[in-house]
Amino acid sequence: MRKAGFLAFLLASSLGLAQGVVFLSTQLRPIEEAQKMRQVILKGFSGQVQFVPEDYPVWLNRVLAEAQTGRGTVGVLGGLHGDFPPLVSRGLLEPLDGLYARLQDRGFPQAFVELGRMGTPNQQYLPWMQATYVMVARKEALKYLPPGADLNALTYEDLKNWAKAIQEATGQRRLGFPAGPGGLIHRFLQGYLYPSYTGSQVRRFKSPEAEAMWRDFRELWRYVNPRSTAYEFMQEPLLSGEVWIAWDHTARLKDALVQRPQDFVAFPAPAGPKGRGFMPVVAGLAIPKTAPDKRAAEALVDYLTRPEVQLLTLKEVGFFPVVRVRYGEDLPEGIRLLAEAVSAQSSAKDALPSLLPVGLGDKGGEVNKVYRDAFTRIVLRGEEIRRALDLEAQNLARILRETGAPCWPPDAPSTGACPVE
């Protein structure tokens, strides 16, 4: 089996130069997405491209093998932010500062550009595409917005006052979160609430700022629909009218906006004292130092980040743009509403991206459970905040010690396991 794998690698190496730029990607692996990439998205590129989607271990091992031999065939790498650290730590990526300087007028979100430096002085990757979580409201909720509140620049205080006004006027708790067993409330806590209040996801887990955050969220929960503990996809209660305002992943909100775009608005998540925390799933484009034709590789990165190609990517495979674009009439109205909210969130002046937990192996679910358990203890059961945080911080610290996972953004880098301070 190993021999067959090595022969396949040699064959890929021999074919690489003949096929133009070899584009090795951990993203768009499903057959349908890969076909759309080859037949539609890459069709307008002036050169030849061989799009090779692979699972992460195969992707990583191929790049490491080419670096070891000093003979590369791969021209461009596509991957999630969390795919690149092993390559950055070994110094295997070509700095893209010059390419970014040429393309920066496309309006890449500064928060994503900073992520692409991977904690180094140089641009390790350029943003390629994103998925994320936003908020959606039924239009009848808008008349209850607090005076002076800007829908695209809400604070958590605004959200509380908005939900409170709706309850006082209608007698109903119309704010909703996906806190059911299959819901993504843990991503809200990790990527939205914690960064917005503490500037951290892990280090400041039990900090005084975290205590204040939980007090505020417990107060907000007074205006949240009690059925939220059963919700998994917020598009359903939004469509039924059971909920008027909701937070969720774009894929779990999409049906409501596509079915009845005239009834809804989409907008960024609120900001807290430390900024507008949000959790993007960021994919980037990098060039390995062993790339056989760096000029052709740069041309492909240039092509994939053009506004019109970014829009094509959204239409064909559902990933949102990471450059400034103008959404046209050919885009379904509901998708356009979501896309505009995604763009507004990532390009906000106070945007504070918080990444999915990385380096946890098969213990990612245990970390998610820590956040969900803290929520259950503090918000649903009303336990004393300090005691609950101290207990759950012990669980979080234990998992991080066991995995040795270093800190990830927005937390500052760590040597060894990320500490719970």
Label every PLM stretch briefly.
Residues 21-22, 39-108, 144-146, 244-245, ...:
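Extracytoplasmic "Venus flytrap"/periplasmic binding protein-like
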Residues 160-166, 199-231, 257:
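Glycine-centered hinge/linker elements that transmit conformational signals in sensory
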Residues 20-37, 362-363:
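Extracytoplasmic "Venus flytrap"
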Residues 188, 215-293, 419:
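Extracytoplasmic/periplasmic substrate-binding proteins
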Residues 116-129, 133, 157-202, 243:
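Extracytoplasmic/periplasmic solute-binding protein
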Residues 98-108, 151-152, 194-213, 258-259, ...:
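Short, solvent-exposed loop/beta-turn-alpha elements that line the ligand-binding surface or hinge
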Residues 315-373, 377, 405-421:
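Long, aromatic- and glycine/proline-rich binding clefts that accommodate carbohydrate-like moieties
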Residues 80-134, 157-160, 265-267:
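Hinge/lid segment of periplasmic solute-binding proteins
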